[in-house]
Amino acid sequence: MDKSKSSIEKELNRIKQDVSLSAFSILFSEMVQYCLYKSKRGYRIEDCLHEMGLRVGYKLNEYLTYKNKVKRSINIINILTFISKHVWKYLFQHSSDLLKSQDSIYEYMICDKNILLNKFINVPKDYGNINCAAFAAGIVEGFLCSSEFQADVTAHTIHEGDDNYNTTIFIKFYPEVVEREKNH
């Protein structure tokens, strides 16, 4: 008798990861709607999206480390390279650019010319400029913190036309993280 494996029995690294763009946009718009609802009770929309992203980042760290069969990174450049290449490709189907700040040894940036998170969301004008890329900033912060690289992560988006968004994920590591790396 030929038994095929159920989806639960398949290895994690063999399951196809594709999600349709329409399903993603509906799910993400519902997340934004939920944050809009919470904002009416005095909670900032970006903070709500960032908090949701934190939870995703923690879980994504465990999953991608196992899936890609890589050792956990022990220095800042390696973890940021992993995020800008592998994590970004897993989430958004393309890699992003990693930049180091010229002003501070604690600051790095991940730049994405056209992030999906800002593409399909129309926020009412009375809410001002809401940056939905705060969700991606939360994912990066969760990923870093679960790897013991504590940092504050924020998202900044510049609109460069109708459908073009230049998003920068700004990462500022805590001084003790940079000092720990210097001592090793």
From Swiss-Prot:
Statement: the UniProt record of this protein carries the keyword Membrane: yes
One Pfam family from the record: TRAPP
CDD domains listed in its UniProt record: TRAPPC5_Trs31
UniProt entry keywords in alphabetical sequence: Cell membrane, Endoplasmic reticulum, ER-Golgi transport, Golgi apparatus, Host membrane, Malaria, Membrane, Transport
Residue ranges of coiled coil: none
Keyword match Transmembrane: no
Recorded family membership: Belongs to the TRAPP small subunits family. BET3 subfamily.
Function: May play a role in vesicular transport from endoplasmic reticulum to Golgi.
Name of protein: Trafficking protein particle complex subunit 5
Taxonomic classification: Eukaryota, Sar, Alveolata, Apicomplexa, Aconoidasida
